[in-house]
A protein has these predicted regions:
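Betabetaalpha-Me/HNH-type nuclease active-site subdomain
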Residues: 47-140
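Alpha-helical structural elements
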Residues: 19, 37-39, 57, 63, ...
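C-terminal, well-folded lobe of enzymatic/effector domains
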Residues: 15-25, 41, 129-230
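Amphipathic alpha-helical interaction segments
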Residues: 32-34, 76, 159-160, 174
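N-terminal Sec-pathway targeting helices
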Residues: 2-14
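Secretory/periplasmic and organellar redox-cofactor proteins
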Residues: 11-13, 22-23, 32-33
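Ser/Thr/Pro/Gly-rich low-complexity linker/stalk segments immediately outside membranes or between
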Residues: 28-42
């Protein structure tokens, strides 16, 4: 009996250490993937942006833009084949698997008729953010270039600090229940409204692979304008 207990204890100890080793390996690979992304130049250059700056447009509401990552990555692979740019390796490489991710939180002009009518680059061309700050928000916005660009283009029009902007969009994102599989637009709307009571009677927006949820200036859910130019 004693020998059996000793054997069981030995098996337990071995399994425990194997589990620890597997966990260490997984998180080291995760960290390695993150380091690969942020150890590079991910600055966003305003003069190269095709839409440009609009620092006089008012902010009347916000749009949280969520992207279905598998579809986004499929499009990137069609474009680049096996030669993905470094900026896409974290999101679309083989080490990570994302579903719905944050594209950005956009201050919006309620009277906009085109994308350029919305607030953009309100603080001008900003310096590259610290690596540690970028790493913190990669789980929900899986790209250093994405985070840097969204801060410069959109976040700086409503927030004084990048961290406050990233915290707010992550806070909104984490209140949501989102499907783990792809759905057609109307099915997606039904699923989201059924599983998020706060959105039940709310008009949502969508593009081909993105979902739009709108908020007033106090970050209460509101109907997205039906003819909005995102």
């Amino acid at each position: 009996m004693k020998e059996k207990q000793t054997l069981q204890l030995s098996v337990f100890v071995v399994c425990f250490f194997m589990l620890l080793l597997a966990g260490w390996y997984y998180f080291s690979k995760q960290k390695q993937a993150v380091i690969t992304v942020v150890e590079r130049d991910y600055d966003y250059v305003m003069k190269n942006d095709p839409i440009g700056q609009n620092k006089t447009a008012p902010t009347d509401y916000y749009t949280l833009v969520l992207s279905w990552s598998p579809a986004f990555c499929d499009n990137q692979r069609k474009r680049y084949g096996n030669q993905l740019p470094k900026s896409l390796e974290y999101q679309c490489g083989t080490t990570q698997h994302f579903g719905w991710v944050i594209h950005g939180l956009w201050p919006q002009n309620g009277k906009a008729r085109r994308v350029s009518d919305h607030p953009r680059f309100c603080q001008g061309d900003l310096p590259m953010l610290d690596h540690a700050l970028i790493e913190k928000y990669l789980p929900e916005s899986p790209g250093a270039n994405l985070l840097q660009g969204q801060w410069e283009k959109h976040g700086a029009c409503a927030f004084d600090q990048a961290e406050n902007y990233f915290e707010k969009q992550r806070e909104l994102y984490r209140t949501l229940q989102l499907p783990h599989y792809e759905l057609a637009k109307n099915d997606l709307f039904r699923w989201v409204k059924k599983n998020n009571p706060a959105l039940k009677d709310t008009y949502l927006g969508a593009s081909r692979n993105e979902l739009f949820i709108c908020y007033d200036l106090s970050f209460n859910v509101m109907d997205c304008p039906r003819n909005s130019s995102y």
